[in-house]
């Protein structure tokens, strides 16, 4: 089991539930825009939120933002260690840095000391695009071993400063490399791991890459917190994260819709019905499994694990629950009958 750190009031690692993170795409110094985006993310289910801090103005906005939100706030720092110190003074809940890119060991120690005094954890955030030149030369490019060596070098740097309140990420945009790096890292350290596939792209491909790269690791028991990185509204990242956690069997946050791919036995126009059921399930928070099946011959049996479901036929279909047929229903009433049964659950 990994060690546990506290990011504000959210436990990460040590058997705590896998938490969902996102990152604002607003200018952090624009407090109003940033707060409004965070409030939308909270409503969607985000549990830890990160903001970029590239300037002193952004760092000084941290207290005003924290005062109006309800989830832990993380500062993303590159190069300027003084910005990390300002954020620590402003009450930040976690700092993300690469210790190797903020200067001398004295500067790293200053950040470590400021965080230790205030109980602020540090995430070592290694990205394939910013690997050290010597590691790129040693391994001939971005490899899993290069990512892990970079991360462990940063860990030693913080440990040498007497700092142990650490979370680690090793992200790149190539899913197999990403997964291998996290598996290697898990074998070498028990610090909590922040999962993600960086630069995953737009939702169409980015969600697929993240589902494989993050969901695959979660199914192997690797990972303590995650962010799905998408070129999109950050709320979409949170929705995707919840779906990945549900598909991996980690957390249920609503209904699970199962439906068959249809075949020659299907005697009704099932695809639009499945989509209508999916649409009407939005907003439902019941942790149930709902089935839409293509035929009355195999449907109820194949979906016997579903809490409730429908199977269509020619002109009429079946409403069933836990594999047992409840009644026949005219085809045009199937969806309404299904949701009447869902309301009873």
Protein language model annotation of sequence segments:
Residues 1-23, 116, 279:
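N-terminal amphipathic alpha-helix/helix-capping segment at the start of soluble metabolic enzymes
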Residues 15-33, 52-54, 71-79, 135-148, ...:
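Active-site mouth loops of central-metabolism enzymes
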Residues 18-24, 49-51, 73-77, 95-97, ...:
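Hydrophobic faces of well-ordered beta-strands that scaffold small-molecule active sites
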Residues 25, 31, 42-68, 96-104, ...:
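Glycine-rich, proline-tolerant flexible connector loops at the mouths of alpha/beta enzymes
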Residues 82-123:
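Hydrophobic or amphipathic alpha-helical targeting/insertion segments
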Residues 127-130, 135-282:
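Catalytic alpha/beta core domains of metabolic enzymes, predominantly
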């Amino acid at each position: 089991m990994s060690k546990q750190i506290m990011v504000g009031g959210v436990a990460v690692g040590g058997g705590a539930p896998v938490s969902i993170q996102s990152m604002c795409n607003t200018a952090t110094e624009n407090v109003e825009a940033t707060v409004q985006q965070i409030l939308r993310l909270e409503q969607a289910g985000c549990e830890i939120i990160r903001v970029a801090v590239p300037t002193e103005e952004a760092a000084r906005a941290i207290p005003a933002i924290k005062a109006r939100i309800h989830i832990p706030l993380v500062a993303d720092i590159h190069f300027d260690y003084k910005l990390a110190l300002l954020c620590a003074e402003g009450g930040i809940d976690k700092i993300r840095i690469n210790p190797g890119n903020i200067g001398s060991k004295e500067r790293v120690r200053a950040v470590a000391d400021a965080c230790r005094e205030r109980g602020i954890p540090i995430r070592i955030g290694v990205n394939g695009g910013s690997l050290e030149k010597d590691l790129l030369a040693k391994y001939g490019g971005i490899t899993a071993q290069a990512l892990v060596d970079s991360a462990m070098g940063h860990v030693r740097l913080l440990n040498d400063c007497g700092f142990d309140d650490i979370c680690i990420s090793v992200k790149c945009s190539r899913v197999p490399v990403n997964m291998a790096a996290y598996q290697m890292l898990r074998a070498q350290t028990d610090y909590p791991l922040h999962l993600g596939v960086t630069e995953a792209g737009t939702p169409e491909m980015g969600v697929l890459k993240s589902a494989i790269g993050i969901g695959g690791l979660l199914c192997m028991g690797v990972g303590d917190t995650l962010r799905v990185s998408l070129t999109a509204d950050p709320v979409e990242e949170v929705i995707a994260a919840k779906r990945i956690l549900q598909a991996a069997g980690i957390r249920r946050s609503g209904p699970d819709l199962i439906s068959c791919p249809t075949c020659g036995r299907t005697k009704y126009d099932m695809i639009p019905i499945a989509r209508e059921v999916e649409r009407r399930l939005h907003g439902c928070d019941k942790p149930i499994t709902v089935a839409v099946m293509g035929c009355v011959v195999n449907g109820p049996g194949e979906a016997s694990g579903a809490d409730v479901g429908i199977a269509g036929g020619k002109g009429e279909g079946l409403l069933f629950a836990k594999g047992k047929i409840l009644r026949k229903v005219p085809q045009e009433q199937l969806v309404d009958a299904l949701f009447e049964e869902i309301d009873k659950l």
